[in-house]
Amino acid sequence: MEKKYKTLKAFYPYYLTEHSDPTCRVLHYIGTSLVILVLIWAILQPVWWKFILLPLVGYSFAWVGHFKFEKNKPATFIYPLYSLASDFIMLYHFLIGKIDEKLAEAKMIIAQENKNEL
């Protein structure tokens, strides 16, 4: 299957529109924040099993958000690296108070892409 998005910059608006539900985003923020904390913990006190916690912590929150609230499949299944990077970018935009602005921009970009595909 040919992937539509070739760059993270092109992918991120799509990623945001797949995270329109506020509860889904909050679950992603929790999961991504916990991943950061577990990573720091695993680096400071290295034990192999702590590194296994990283995907478990991150994906468990994200996937509950997608399947229960957003009602879609995680973009991770098709774009794993772009999705991982986008999790951190989305958390950053939330922390600096720009997530609503970025989500509105993303919706316009994706609407234009969809219009151009017709």
Task: Report the location of each language-model feature.
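Membrane-proximal soluble regions of multi-pass membrane proteins
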Residues: M1-Y15, K71-L118
